[in-house]
């Protein structure tokens, strides 16, 4: 054990020790190292670096920094670089101000960058240690800062550089060819001199460039506007924007693209939006009038670049669209054809839908504006709901020529677009019910499928409450068909005769159909009256407790008519007749399709040849308004439908006028439909007032029901809040006025459904 300890002890005594590196150097030696490095730096700046040993220079720089002489090395470097840039480089650049300035500056910049890379490599250890410890700029950046301050930003060099670049760009804008590479190099230099920032580039070039550009484009805009149409101006602005983007891409820093484009947009678009849009014979309205979708698309694309650009376009488009719409719906020309009226609106909508798709990129703002405009002018005319229903009526009737089912479907879809814009949907519903009833009862529907498809569209739009009555009408028609089959079987089984009358009865549910509460009187002739009484007894025997009321205004009849007189030509000679069934030399037979009122009038003439207006009124008991309309259809309609003659021969029906059968009546058709006067023109003024009164009565009930529903749920509400809630609930059908809502609230208070609170009379409570 003792030997081991000795051995261990002797190894410890002979262990090597490393002596600490001396931290101080002789000043003379330090100066000699610096002189060596200084000379090398100067040689590099003079581009005489071929004989230098970079390894030796690195080692000497390393030694200086290691021995805490980094500050001397850093300060010395700054002085040497500064001296070279001031005495040599700056002088060369100043001498070139009037000759090859950019090339000289660019060469000096490239040489300086190359030199600083070499110097940085030599002084790499100083960058890693001294620069990090003392938080100063690294070698390369120090070189950039000195070049920036002593050369590029030196008084007249800075000004001359800026002016040279601006002049070159101005010349290029005028069409001259310039050295783009020189501009690009100068801009890259300014960006690098910003040391990862844009300040140098921005202050020395970009800011004055944008200012100069604004002045240039301001003058150019005046020239462009004076010399060009709107579409050409737009194309020139587009070209100018593209040119500036292309210049940035090839010459300037990419960060300049956004500000220069904004300058162009401000000077060429924003400041002149109204002028461009309203240009006479070439602006937006001109483009819309002439369907210039491409020009509109160019304008949209350009104006979408600037704030409020699309708003300016929209406002101008809206003014034009409203003018067009108001002209279409104006009530000046009474007797306007409803089908043409709606078709005109649909054509206008199609035009603007095309602009929306092809020119305005289906833009939401334009879409909403167009919809708002259509809603505005469609509701200016109180007859719009009636006319829309008549338009649909026309498309769903049998005999619409040249339209496939798919085409009818497309038209109905377009009609539904107008329906959505309509505020008085309840008025439309009332008219639609009337027109549907007429189609169903006269068997004029093109098909049940088309009818049900239309009702389905209305249901999707407004809900099942809106269409429940319309669907009920179809159920009634189906049940009536079954009832008539049973009635005919009953007649066969009992041998009861209807006296030659082919009777079809439709039993209608009062709530579904547009029946009249006060049914117009009419003395039905004995034969059809007798036939109906047989049906009445049959029906009531099956359905005890029910009541049947004849709705004369909804009925129709086919009459066998025989005309005996000769047909005369204008020269007085008599002619035979083609088309009618001729039984004798001059006897002609036709089937006349007429209303119940017209049938009642015509069957009088089986008894006598002549009747005065008063006699017809007394015999038939038809209300005067209905009688006048029926007689106008029979005696004052088209010659091919004039089955009665009237004395005197005027278009008006008045007391004392005498009516006889027109024995000279002829038609190429065996089956002649006697049109009701003005049937396609919509209701007369008195009828419209009556319809409006019925609508107003219905609305009172709907408003009251909505008020009660809301108050039952909320119990207590302030007046304005209740009015707003009621309006919100009913707007899908109509827009109730606050005045009407207030009246209905007062009515409910009187009937003790609601009460005012004692502390605030504008607050209501629900009375359970």
Curated annotation (Swiss-Prot):
UniProt modified residues of type N-acetylserine: 2
Tissue/organ expression: Widely expressed, with highest expression in brain, spleen and testis. In the testis, it is mainly expressed in spermatids.
Region listing for Interaction with KLHL18, in residue ranges: 2-41
Protein modification: Neddylated. Attachment of NEDD8 is required for the E3 ubiquitin-protein ligase activity of the BCR complex. Deneddylated via its interaction with the COP9 signalosome (CSN) complex.
Keywords: Acetylation, Cell cycle, Cell division, Cell projection, Cilium, Cilium biogenesis/degradation, Cytoplasm, Cytoskeleton, ER-Golgi transport, Flagellum, Golgi apparatus, Isopeptide bond, Mitosis, Nucleus, Phosphoprotein, Transport, Ubl conjugation, Ubl conjugation pathway
Listed pathway(s): Protein modification; protein ubiquitination
GO CC terms, sorted: centrosome; Cul3-RING ubiquitin ligase complex; cytoplasm; glutamatergic synapse; Golgi apparatus; mitotic spindle; nucleus; plasma membrane
GO MF, one example: ubiquitin ligase complex scaffold activity
Keyword Phosphoprotein among UniProt keywords: yes
Cross-link (Glycyl lysine isopeptide (Lys-Gly) (interchain with G-Cter in NEDD8)): 712
Domain Cullin neddylation, residue spans: 698-760
Database matches in Gene3D superfamilies: Cullin Repeats, Cullin, Chain C, Domain 2, Winged helix-like DNA-binding domain superfamily/Winged helix DNA-binding domain
Pfam family, one: Cullin
Biased composition (Basic and acidic residues): 682-698
Source species, domain of life: Eukaryota
PANTHER family, per database record: CULLIN
Function in brief: Core component of multiple cullin-RING-based BCR (BTB-CUL3-RBX1) E3 ubiquitin-protein ligase complexes which mediate the ubiquitination and subsequent proteasomal degradation of target proteins. BCR complexes and ARIH1 collaborate in tandem to mediate ubiquitination of target proteins. As a scaffold protein may contribute to catalysis through positioning of the substrate and the ubiquitin-conjugating enzyme.
Family: Belongs to the cullin family.
Subunit structure: Forms neddylation-dependent homodimers. Component of multiple BCR (BTB-CUL3-RBX1) E3 ubiquitin-protein ligase complexes formed of CUL3, RBX1 and a variable BTB domain-containing protein acting as both, adapter to cullin and substrate recognition subunit. The BCR complex may be active as a heterodimeric complex, in which NEDD8, covalently attached to one CUL3 molecule, binds to the C-terminus of a second CUL3 molecule. Interacts with RBX1, RNF7 and TIP120A/CAND1. Part of the BCR(SPOP) containing SPOP, and of BCR containing homodimeric SPOPL or the heterodimer formed by SPOP and SPOPL.
Record protein name field: Cullin-3
Source organism per UniProt: Mus musculus
């Amino acid at each position: 054990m003792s030997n081991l300890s000795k051995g261990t002890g002797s190894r410890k005594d002979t262990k090597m020790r490393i002596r600490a590196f001396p931290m101080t150097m002789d000043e003379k030696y330090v100066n000699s190292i610096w002189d060596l490095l200084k000379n090398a730096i100067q040689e590099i700046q003079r581009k005489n670096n071929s004989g230098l040993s970079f390894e030796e220079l690195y080692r000497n720089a390393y030694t200086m920094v290691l021995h805490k002489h980094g500050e001397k090395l850093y300060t010395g470097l700054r002085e040497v670089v500064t001296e070279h840039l001031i005495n040599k480089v700056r002088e060369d650049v100043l001498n070139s101000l009037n000759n090859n300035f950019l090339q000289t500056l660019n060469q000096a910049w490239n040489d300086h960058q190359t030199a600083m890379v070499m110097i940085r490599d030599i002084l790499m250890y100083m960058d890693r240690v001294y620069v990090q410890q003392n938080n100063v700029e690294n070698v390369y950046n120090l070189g950039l800062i000195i070049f920036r301050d002593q050369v590029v930003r030196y008084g007249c060099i800075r000004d001359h550089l800026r002016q040279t670049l601006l002049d070159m760009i101005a010349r290029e804008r005028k069409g001259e060819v310039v050295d783009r590479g020189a501009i690009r190099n100068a801009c890259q230099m300014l960006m690098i001199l910003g040391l990862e920032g844009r300040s140098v580039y921005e202050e020395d070039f970009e800011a004055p460039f944008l200012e100069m550009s604004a002045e240039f484009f301001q003058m150019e805009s005046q020239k462009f506007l004076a010399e060009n149409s709107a579409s050409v101006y737009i194309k020139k602005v587009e070209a100018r924007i593209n040119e500036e983007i292309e210049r940035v891409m090839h010459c300037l820093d990419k960060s300049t693209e956004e500000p220069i484009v904004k300058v162009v947009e401000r000077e060429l678009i924003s400041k002149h939006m109204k002028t461009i849009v309203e240009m006479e014979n070439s602006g937006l309205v001109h483009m819309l009038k002439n369907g210039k979708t491409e020009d509109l698309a160019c304008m949209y694309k350009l104006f979408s670049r600037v704030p409020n650009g699309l708003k300016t376009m929209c406002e101008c488009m809206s003014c034009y669209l409203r003018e067009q719409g108001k002209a279409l719906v104006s009530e000046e020309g009474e007797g306007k054809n409803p089908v043409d009226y709606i078709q005109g609106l649909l054509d206008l909508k199609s035009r603007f839908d095309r602009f929306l798709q092809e020119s305005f990129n289906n833009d939401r703002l334009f879409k909403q504006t167009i919809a708002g405009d259509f809603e505005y002018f469609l509701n200016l005319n109180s007859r719009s709901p009636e006319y829309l229903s008549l338009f649909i009526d026309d498309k769903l009737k049998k005999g619409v020529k040249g339209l496939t089912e798919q085409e009818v479907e497309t038209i109905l879809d377009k009609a539904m677009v107008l329906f959505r814009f309509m505020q008085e949907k309840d008025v439309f519903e009332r008219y639609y019910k009337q027109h549907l009833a007429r189609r169903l009862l006269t068997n004029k529907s093109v098909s049940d499928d088309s009818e049900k498809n239309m009702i389905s569209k209305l249901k999707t739009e407004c809900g099942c409450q809106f269409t429940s009555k319309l669907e009920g009408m179809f159920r009634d028609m189906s049940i009536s068909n079954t009832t008539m089959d049973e009635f005919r079987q009953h007649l066969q089984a009992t041998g009861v005769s209807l006296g030659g009358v082919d009777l079809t009865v439709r039993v209608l549910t009062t709530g579904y159909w547009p029946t009249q509460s006060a049914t117009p009187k009419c003395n039905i002739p004995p034969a059809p009256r007798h036939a109906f009484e047989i049906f009445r007894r049959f029906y009531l025997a099956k359905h005890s407790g029910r009541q049947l009321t004849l709705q004369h205004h909804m009925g129709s009849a086919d009459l066998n008519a025989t005309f005996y007189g000769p047909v005369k030509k204008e020269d007085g000679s008599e002619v035979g007749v083609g088309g009618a069934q001729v039984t004798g030399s001059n006897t002609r037979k036709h089937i006349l399709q007429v209303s119940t009122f017209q049938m009642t009038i015509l069957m009088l003439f089986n008894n006598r040849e002549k009747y005065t207006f008063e006699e017809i009124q007394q015999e038939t008991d038809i209300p005067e308004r209905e009688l006048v309309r029926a007689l106008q259809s029979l005696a004052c309609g088209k010659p091919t439908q004039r089955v009665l003659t009237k004395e005197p021969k005027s278009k008006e029906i008045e007391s004392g006028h005498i009516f006889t059968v027109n024995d000279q009546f002829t038609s190429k058709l065996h089956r002649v439909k006697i049109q009701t006067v003005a049937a396609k023109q919509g209701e007369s003024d008195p009828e419209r007032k009556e319809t409006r009164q019925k609508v107003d009565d219905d609305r009172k009930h709907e408003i009251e029901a909505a008020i009660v529903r809301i108050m039952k749920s909320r119990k207590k509400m302030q007046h304005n809040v209740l009015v707003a809630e009621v309006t919100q609930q009913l707007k899908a059908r109509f827009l109730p006025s606050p005045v009407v809502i207030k009246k209905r609230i007062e009515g409910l208070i009187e009937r003790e459904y609601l009460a005012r609170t004692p502390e605030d009379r504008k607050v209501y409570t629900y009375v359970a």
